[in-house]
UniProtKB/Swiss-Prot annotation:
Top EC class of this enzyme: ligase
Record's keyword annotation contains Ligase: yes
Catalytic activity, reaction form: (R)-pantoate + beta-alanine + ATP = (R)-pantothenate + AMP + diphosphate + H(+)
Underlying gene: panC
Name by which UniProt lists this protein: Pantothenate synthetase
Intracellular or extracellular location(s): Cytoplasm
Pathway(s): Cofactor biosynthesis; (R)-pantothenate biosynthesis; (R)-pantothenate from (R)-pantoate and beta-alanine: step 1/1
Amino acid sequence: METISNPQELQNLCLMLRAEGKKIGLVPTMGYFHEGHLSLMDAARKQCDVLIVSLFVNPTQFGENEDLDAYPHNLERDSELAEKRGVDILFTPIRDDMYFEDHSTWVEVPDLATNLCGKSRPIHFRGVATVVTKLFMTAQPHVAVFGQKDWQQLAIIKRMVRDLNIPVDVQGHEIVREESGLALSSRNVYLTEDEKSVAPNIQKGLQKMRDWVTAGESDAAKLKSDLVEFYAETIPTGRVDYIEIVHPENINILKNVGDSALCAVAIQLGNARLIDNLLIKV
């Protein structure tokens, strides 16, 4: 495995690889790998001749008073895990390599970025869309794989690629969970033992909502109200940031559950902001 930190060096290499007919896969990450990240690498590895994993804690997607400085990192551990997974290139740029001091160009997908996480994190998806565009330009991938835990992010990137005619096949990969049902996240390390014991109720609540829909309830307001009550009982130390039922592609908030709907939640539990979702098909 080769480690490259200079964007121009990686771009030159990838342009050469494409000219040679090599199929390039990219898995963008912020590091501190867990089995969720590794499953994305596996999915991309099966499809590509060259697998690139980027490791960059992108400062432009963090707002004030968020956890940029505290975000967990362990480059040595991540490098070992990536190499064992068959990664060919680990891309590890620093901030000054990715953003000039007078950086002034941003990529935004406002129609999909105002609900869910975008409501409480107004600059988040601008930073995500911009850095992913830069990674696509640098790594020149044919395929890029993202986790479905960040469903809104995935929808935004798919729309961005469609609207800007970026020649990348953007794929979503199913959520990987702990045995308890808690969605894997690098931020799970922030949880205390007590918090970790109640966090699996996030997924259980989503499953409850699916059961309510299956039983015939379609009113989104009623479903959300019932889920708020469930979380108040089962995660009393948590604070609900949002519970929404949205269209899975355009992220518009739904008043009634139709043939397909995404229930998405975000809960602040101690120092960890945990997100999860469940696609409900009637």
